[in-house]
Amino acid sequence: TELFGTSVNTSYKFCSPFEVDKKFGSLGSFFNLELTSGMYVANPPFNEKIMTKMSNMLISQLEKKGEEIDIIITIPVWDSVSQKKYNLTDYGMPFQGFEILDTSDFLVEKLFLPKYYAYYSYYADKFISASATHLILLSNYETEKSLDVYKSRWKEVINSDV
């Protein structure tokens, strides 16, 4: 389930803040959703308030007993520690949304994706590098899931002629 999607860019179950998207299968706003057992993907708007609110909500959802929940999150590298670690411009700013996830007991794995790992924009018909990003896997149970499939896929994309 995509936690931040729209009817235009998803074919899976998705959450959207727009009431009209319910006609296309939206589950409604992520912030009103109760997570049940399953895999979720969160690629929120890159807005600090939204990402902090999302991080707090995800942690509270993962604290639920009886549900096996996995969540993959994509957020920008806006935290000073990572900016220094990866030799990026360090703006010296805290990034509470990332810190909540990074210090969580539910953190399974995180992966740094440099800015040159681009995404393909079908609207612009080209690859675009928006920001260096963190790919984070959270889980509330003993899982064997990892980000390995993403690591191997990124290597394929980088080494291709696309």
Features from the language model and the residues they span:
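Class I S-adenosyl-L-methionine
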Residues: T1-A42, F46-V162
